[in-house]
Amino acid sequence: YFGKVYRKETMHKGRSSEFFQGGVELMNKPGLQGDKEVMTMIQESLPGISLKNILLELGSAKFYNRLLELVGNQRNELEDILRLRDISEMKRFVSKNDFEESLNQLLLSLPTCFGNIDLLHQMMDKCQDSVLLGALQELKDLYESLDSKEKIIFDLGMVPTMKYYTGFMIKGYSD
């Protein structure tokens, strides 16, 4: 599906409450096979919707949800910081909590943690948590399975817009 969506905007006054949203429902094809089918369908459909210079941004709800588990009762604050991509608040958040150093370094990188496949490789090298690493590996596997890799970036600080998201997430941007 693809169409106009209207959402009440409380945080950004003056921001349009109308935007376009597309979605795909895929059943009975779990894991990489299903994710690849969805991505391929999206990539093949985009030229038909008259948008120019489309960039696809991939994130992981599994990665995000694990971060929330790791920060425990500080999850709401982390969610707000990531949603706003507030670097100074993230520094304050890390300094006031007693997380492991590897988690601190990961958290500090998240507000600006978006880029190409090289960024994903760098983050995989830094990740110490097996669930986080598994989520990053799933993104890497998806990327490597695609025939068309151009105009795909990763955003590891992406916040799911719906609580029920569990796997990869995608946002599209156009001129």
For the regions a language model picked out, list residue spans one by one:
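Hydrophobic mid-domain F-helix/FG-region of cytochrome P450s
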Residues: M41-P47, K62-G72
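Internal, well-ordered alpha-helical segments in soluble enzyme and binding-protein domains
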Residues: V38, S60-F63, D86, E138
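Short glycine/threonine-rich loop-to-helix capping motif typified by GTGT followed
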Residues: N65-R75, Y164-I170
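Positively charged, Gly/Ser-enriched RNA/tRNA-binding surfaces
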Residues: Y1-K52, K96-D175
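Glycine- and acidic-residue-rich phosphate-binding/metal-coordinating active-site segment common to enzymes
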Residues: L55
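Short, conserved phosphate-binding/catalytic loop or strand-edge motifs used
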Residues: E18-G22, L58-R66
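Acidic, His- and aromatic-enriched active-site or binding-groove loops in soluble protein domains
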Residues: N73-F99
